[in-house]
Every structure is written in structure tokens, then in C-alpha cells.
Amino acid sequence: MSIVSRTVTITISVKKLITYIELRYGMESSTCPFCQSGTLISLAAVFFCHSGMEALLSIVCSLAFFHAGTALSSLLASLPFSFSLSLSSCMPILARISDADGIVSMPGIPLGDMENNLLSCALPDSIRLFIKLFRDSISFWILFNSCMPSLSETNLSIVFCILTTSSLTILNSSSIFSLLLVVCTSACFSSAIVSLSSFNVSLSFFLNSACSASMALRTVSILEN
């Protein structure tokens, strides 16, 4: 099992433990010293690094994305629903770019010149991964923000293992575009699931585990192939 697989596995376990402690004892991440998600995830990553430099990079990336994702979540939560609708208009092109190896022709849907140019580009696997993550997270955020807009201003301290997964992935890429997609993905997932947590705790816990596992498996499969 590679370092990425081990780190993703321990990160999911740590996040589930954090969620259990919060639900069992009624604590929040900001008030429980043992429930600081960014710190625990960073420490967990250290045990699965082969060198001191990898451990340092894991800590820096985890904490950086923890704070960046939390800050951007506040911004996304305050955006009007009209903006989320405009984001949904870019979903088809994101889907085609991320799922296509070349130009894709969909029956009954003509592709414009700009879209053809984008689809004809040979994208690295890491870029395709981030586009998929971005597309999925935008979908979640649009859904929950439209259903429960009044619950968006909630505790934004819960950041999921997608932060660490993304931070480890970004170490293999120097693209600024990839970095921006990581931050947006983390913020969207955080905003969506945190909003849901104040509505239904058990459903939030289930989605947290499902989304974490899904994104982690997708990341590991792409990085190891």
C-alpha cells in the first residue's frame, strides 16, 4: 500500500473518530482540543511518511487547506442562489472535460468552437481528478444551498478529509489551476455538508463518510494507476 493510500485510510478513520466524539459528547471542533481536524489529520499523515520532508509537507498542506477551505466556505455560504445557478451552467462542460480523453460528441447537443478546443486538449490525470472533484462538490453545494439557504451560516469548523486528500495530490502537480480547484473543492464540500449537519446530524454523518470514502478511492485509483 502506497503512502497516499495509507494516509487517505488513516485520514478517514481520524475524521470518523472526530465526528463520533463531537456527536457523543456534544463538542464542537473549536471547543474540543482533541477535535481540531486540521491538527489531527496532519499528525496522522506524519506516521505514514517515509521522510521528514514528506511529513513537513503534509503538515503544511493540511493546515493551509484547512484554513483556506474554512475561509472560502464562509464566502460561498453568503453568495446568492442566482450565483449558484450560474455555476450550474458550467457543469456540462466540466463533465465532458473530466470524462473525455479527446473530443466528445453527444447526440443532439452541438459543441461550440470554444468547447471543442477545450475538449481537444490532452489533460493530465491530476487535472481531470480536480475537475471531477470540483464538479461533484459544486453539485452538492448548489443542491443544499438551494434547499436550506437559511442554514448556511453555521459552524464552519468541520473540514473533511478531502482537504488532506487534495493536499497530498497537489504535491504531485505544480499547476496553479490545480491548486485553485483544490481550494474550491474543499470549500464547496465543507459548505454543503456543514449546512446539512445542522439539519440532520445522522444524515450528515452518513454523507460525510460516503463522500470521504468516494473521493479518497477516486484519488488513490488515479494516483496509483
Swiss-Prot record:
Miscellaneous comment as given in the Swiss-Prot or TrEMBL entry: Partially overlaps PEX14.
Domain of life of the organism encoding this protein: Eukaryota
Membrane-traversing stretches: 40-60, 63-83, 151-171, 176-196
Keyword Transmembrane listed: yes
Major site of localization recorded for this protein: membrane
Keyword Zinc: no
Organism from which the protein derives: Saccharomyces cerevisiae (strain ATCC 204508 / S288c) (Baker's yeast)
Name by which UniProt lists this protein: Putative uncharacterized protein YGL152C
Compartments where located: Membrane
CC per GO annotation: membrane
Membrane topology: Multi-pass membrane protein
Swiss-Prot/TrEMBL keywords: Membrane, Transmembrane, Transmembrane helix
